[in-house]
Swiss-Prot record:
Known role: Aspartyl-tRNA synthetase with relaxed tRNA specificity since it is able to aspartylate not only its cognate tRNA(Asp) but also tRNA(Asn). Reaction proceeds in two steps: L-aspartate is first activated by ATP to form Asp-AMP and then transferred to the acceptor end of tRNA(Asp/Asn).
Stated name of the protein: Aspartate--tRNA(Asp/Asn) ligase
Localization (cell): Cytoplasm
PANTHER family in UniProt: ASPARTATE--TRNA LIGASE, MITOCHONDRIAL, ASPARTYL/LYSYL-TRNA SYNTHETASE
Site (Important for tRNA non-discrimination) residue list: 33
Classification via NCBIfam families: aspS_bact, PRK00476.1
UniProt KW keywords: Aminoacyl-tRNA synthetase, ATP-binding, Cytoplasm, Ligase, Nucleotide-binding, Protein biosynthesis
One GO term of the biological process aspect: aspartyl-tRNA aminoacylation
Keyword Aminoacyl-tRNA synthetase listed: yes
Annotated region (Aspartate), positions in chain: 199-202
Length: 596
């Protein structure tokens, strides 16, 4: 028999009854039932119930073991009685009668429990992450993450992609987030950077003729901590394709990601045909470029119904500024004054003046609008709004007014709040879509100039002609995001592979041809030697896994994450370097300036 085990703790079945076996694992818990000891032994695969009765030669040792000790048990497999069968366990029809127990490793008193969902401070859990990872939910999440990545590799191979790895030590990139820098010992005073993404390398692979590339790529960004992103590093399914339009990318990756979601969705419905929603339409209907389509609320403009109306606040805004619009947020089943007042109070708590509203109720056979706005604009306009929005008895509608460029985010938050408060959101499904036709440029209020709205390497729609002859703020890009349940899970574009068009695009944001050559020299040079039309995307693995397992926090799907202060409490990073290391790197730390 093997030194440590003949079976795992999830392997034994009724067919093994009568066999003498050996298992090893962690003591999950010990229970004393009338002098008979029951030990739940746990390993990576599952749990087996072990019985040590007073007549067993192993009983004396069984009395000494404690939770999370690592032990080996030899014993006889017996069938459980019918009334003790546990159908929730894979091994629930048997139990192992211990004949010999060996302690392989004792455990000190635990700083936190390893079963259930402990409400322990996050820093304690991260410091003792090796214990936290023993929890069933977290352990299962990590295994699921690995399975999802394996499925991604399989599916990408099935549609003709090949995995290539790109360098981890690379040049610092001036665009995007702050780089993590790595000093060079051989070239004092110079630095490598950890890649924020393999963007330029994957495009160079297309120029080199590799056609369909992918990798499970680690990405590093020195960003301030955010709730929806792990500090330091994250992983993405990175891909690039040659001789493609954006429709080719959508038609390849939409079905592929649907199959991934269906494989791990545990029966929840998954969108098969992803809608393609233009960016402007997404902002107009949902107040967000990453809409949660499980929420059925669709906003509409109702400006005409308030123009010249008796509600002087809205009517005056419309008359004085052509940019002003009134957006309606329909809320089916929200037609009670209590709910409307609750939404109004919520709006005020976010710093807004409030939310105007109308709700409808039947008075006898007549359907009437109620609330201050209904009284001010009159019955005819109120009914016209109700008809346009398809509302009825017991429904409500909220209104946001002003320049949509300034209020759309709040309108989107109000849509989300109403949908959640009224339980309109079906949480047991995965709604996926493409957001397309992003603006190529945007106006930077901070710098008072035109800047890139998203990816500067995207191809502008209309190409060089658009850059030379259009208002830059009207130019769209061949750029797209994939969205699931209100989360951006991917971003991609058709790339700008023309040197002339590339320079023209950067000139719009104030960079010269020399700046382009200095900052993106490798890519710029490559495009002068025959670059195929190409495009791709990057899918966020961490976020996809978080959605699939229903985790609320990215730390629940990551092995050894940092805390919100970007510290690895388990390994003690970051930490000061030894003086000899700093001398080798020609570096002298400068203490930060203390703020008064």
């Amino acid at each position: 028999m093997h030194r440590y085990r003949s079976h795992t703790c999830a392997a034994l079945r009724k067919s093994d009854v009568g066999s003498t076996v050996r298992i090893s694992g962690w003591v999950h818990r010990v229970r004393d039932h009338g002098g008979v000891l029951f030990i739940d032994l746990r390993d990576h695969y599952g749990i087996t119930q072990v019985v040590a009765d007073p007549d067993s030669p192993a009983f004396q040792m069984a009395e000494t073991v404690r939770g999370e000790w690592v032990i080996r048990i030899d014993g006889l497999v017996k069938a459980r009685t019918e009334d003790t069968v546990n159908k929730t366990m894979a091994t629930g029809e048997i139990e192992l009668y211990a004949q010999e127990i060996e302690v392989l490793s004792a455990a000190k008193e635990l700083p936190l429990p390893v079963f259930g969902e402990p409400d322990y401070p996050e820093d304690v859990r991260l410091k003792y992450r090796f214990l936290d990872l023993r929890r069933e939910t977290l352990h299962r999440n990590i295994v699921k993450r690995t399975q999802v990545i394996s499925a991604m590799r399989r599916e990408m191979g099935n549609v003709g992609f090949t995995e290539y790895t790109t360098p981890i030590l690379t040049a610092s990139s001036p665009e995007g987030a702050r780089d993590f820098l790595v000093p060079s010992r051989i070239h004092p005073g110079t630095f490598y950077a950890l890649p924020q993404a393999p963007q330029q390398y994957k495009q160079l692979l297309m120029v080199a003729g590799f056609d369909r590339y992918f990798q499970i790529a680690p990405c590093f960004r020195d960003e301030d901590p955010r709730a929806d992103r792990l500090p330091g590093e994250f992983y993405q399914l990175d891909l690039e394709m040659s001789f493609v339009t954006q429709e080719d990318v959508w038609n390849t990756m939409g079905p592929l990601m649907t199959s991934i979601f269906e494989e791990f969705a545990e029966g929840k419905p998954v969108t098969k045909e992803w809608p393609r929603i233009p960016y402007d339409e997404a902002i107009r209907k949902y107040g967000s470029d990453k809409p949660d389509l499980r929420n059925p609320i669709v906003m509409q403009a109702v400006t005409e119904h308030f123009a010249g109306s008796g509600f002087k606040v809205f009517a005056g805004m419309i008359a004085s500024n052509p940019k002003v619009e009134i957006w309606a947020i329909p809320a089916k089943t929200g037609g009670s004054r209590a709910f409307c007042d609750r939404m109004n109070a919520w709006a005020q708590s976010t710093g807004q003046p409030g939310l105007g509203y109308i709700f409808w109720r039947k008075e006898g056979d007549k359907l009437e609008g109620a609330g201050p706005l209904a009284k001010n604009i009159g019955e005819e306009r109120t009914d016209a709004i109700r008809t346009q929005l398809g509302l009825d008895d017991g429904d409500a509608c909220f209104f946001v007014a002003g320049d949509p460029a300034k209020f759309y985010k709040f309108a989107g938050e109000a849509r989300t709040k109403a949908g959640e408060e009224l339980n309109l959101v079906d949480r047991d499904r995965f709604e996926l879509c493409w957001i397309v036709d992003f603006p190529f440029f945007e106006w930077s209020e901070e710098d008072k100039k035109v800047d890139f709205a998203h990816n500067p390497f995207s191809m502008p729609q209309g190409g060089l002609d658009a850059l030379q002859n259009q208002d830059p703020l009207t130019i769209k890009a061949f750029q797209y995001d994939a969205v699931c349940n209100g989360f951006e899970i991917a971003s991609g574009s058709i790339r700008n592979q023309s040197p002339e068009t590339m320079v023209a695009a950067f000139e719009k944001v104030g960079l010269s041809q020399q700046d382009v050559e200095d900052r993106f020299g490798g890519l710029y040079r490559a495009f002068q030697y025959g670059a195929p039309p190409h495009g791709g995307a990057a899918f966020g693995i961490d976020r996809i896994v978080m959605l699939l397992v229903g985790a609320k926090n990215l730390r629940e799907i990551s092995l050894f994450p940092m805390n919100q202060q970007a510290q690895d409490l388990l390994m003690g990073a970051p930490s000061p370097a030894a003086p000899t290391q700093l001398r080798e790197l020609s570096i002298r730390p400068i203490p930060p300036v203390k703020k008064d």
